[in-house]
Amino acid sequence: MASQGTKRSYEQMETGGERQNATEIRASVGRMVGGIGRFYIQMCTELKLSDYEGRLIQNSITIERMVLSAFDERRNKYLEEHPSAGKDPKKTGGPIYRRRDGKWMRELILYDKEEIRRIWRQANNGEDATAGLTHLMIWHSNLNDATYQRTRALVRTGMDPRMCSLMQGSTLPRRSGAAGAAVKGVGTMVMELIRMIKRGINDRNFWRGENGRRTRIAYERMCNILKGKFQTAAQRAMMDQVRESRNPGNAEIEDLIFLARSALILRGSVAHKSCLPACVYGLAVASGYDFEREGYSLVGIDPFRLLQNSQVFSLIRPKENPAHKSQLVWMACHSAAFEDLRVSSFIRGTRVVPRGQLSTRGFQIASNENMEAMDSSTLELRSRYWAIRTRSGGNTNQQRASAGQISVQPTFSVQRNLPFERATIMAAFTGNTEGRTSDMRTEIIRMMESARPEDVSFQGRGVFELSDEKATNPIVPSFDMSNEGSYFFGDNAEEYDN
């Protein structure tokens, strides 16, 4: 990718910063997570949570959601203009769980959004600290990616459930900025664009007038974000076609679906970063760790280190398996929902199983669930090794855009070969190469056909011992190739419902 020089690193996107050197980036990312930690500690004080209750991931999620809701300007404005029954637009809240006489109790709390904003700003040196808010959104998005399936949403937009490995970040709110755009998968961007085009088909005023002009700008910006994720000239040229279309319609939807399919072999570059629950940063700050002084990176050893010595708990339903619950959070913390299970298992040091074999449901507990039978257990979030997070699709060499890894979107920059059955994927490309994008389609199909399963991605990259913080001795794992590496195999997870 020749354009590397013009790109800001994730950390710069994440902190809204201009060009900075590595030390400055580490410091500003440190300032960001330190602010989240200070905010969390303050909220625990406000709510009088015990140490144990403050380490409960459900409480962390409620507190994170409250601050995100307090800063959601668009929704706040909407709520004030459309007062709905029983919703106070100025308040936010959620369930907080407390330990009383050996049992867990649910308490619904309500806070002024203004008060939450004040506490957040106070924890962030008086600033709005949007970067920290985005960071929390990405953690929630990673948790959703690991917990829920999006088959319904895929089918609704005319895509194929087999494209689920392209759906990273599909539940991120639109306001998540550049850092959010970086972690969205190709399928997520395609889906957002298709929804937009469909609205334009059904509502003739969608692209017209002053509003329509703004819509058009948003459409072109989304096209450019998606174009930037593709690594081959033909895919990018096709995106130019979609972007420049006078009035986008079914032809563009066809092109986008074709591109999404092609991304199963010619993978897009999607960023991965380890975003941890607020309570983890809170614990570290409370123990006297100075993130800004020490510096922090979302794509290196730091999150692994932090998780090695953080004790976090989760409420657990009677029939759930605590080890499976831990796996979900571990995957979410490292943004590894779409990673090859062989790679994840090696790094984690315990077997990571496909979602179809997990006996656990989501983390949020519905208000009608019985608390009597609720227990809590420690989440096992430690790892055996650490590895650098990648921002590429795992293509072996950029010159001839070879195959990225199929049915997964690599998270860790670790050498692996590609377990894929090309015939299965090529079957999705029956015929249709006519129309104005025919030459590009032909070229893309040709590249896909020449992709070889025996290719190796991330050549020579390995994992590192946790004592090797400078990443000096890569250990290149060898994998059993007979195993299918996809997490979504035999999927039976719940659908994500907003």
From Swiss-Prot:
Species of origin: Influenza A virus (strain A/Tern/South Africa/1961 H5N3)
Q: Which UniProt keywords apply?
A: Capsid protein, Helical capsid protein, Host nucleus, Host-virus interaction, Ribonucleoprotein, RNA-binding, Viral nucleoprotein, Viral penetration into host nucleus, Virion, Virus entry into host cell
How it assembles, according to the record, is:
Homomultimerizes to form the nucleocapsid. May bind host exportin-1/XPO1. Binds to viral genomic RNA. Protein-RNA contacts are mediated by a combination of electrostatic interactions between positively charged residues and the phosphate backbone and planar interactions between aromatic side chains and bases.
Record bears the keyword 4Fe-4S: no
Q: Per the record, which residues fall in region Disordered?
A: 1-21
Similarity section: Belongs to the influenza viruses nucleoprotein family.
List the InterPro entries: Flu_NP (IPR002141)
Q: Which residues does UniProt call coiled coil?
A: none
Where the record places motif Unconventional nuclear localization signal is 1-18
Name it: Nucleoprotein
Where does it live in the cell? Virion; Host nucleus
Q: Which SUPFAM superfamilies match?
A: flu NP-like
PTM characteristics: Late in virus-infected cells, may be cleaved from a 56-kDa protein to a 53-kDa protein by a cellular caspase. This cleavage might be a marker for the onset of apoptosis in infected cells or have a specific function in virus host interaction.
Q: In terms of domain of life, where is this protein from?
A: Viruses
Which Gene Ontology molecular function entries are recorded, alphabetically?
A: RNA binding; structural molecule activity
Give the record's GO CC terms.
helical viral capsid; host cell; host cell nucleus; ribonucleoprotein complex; viral nucleocapsid
Residue ranges of the motif Bipartite nuclear localization signal: 198-216
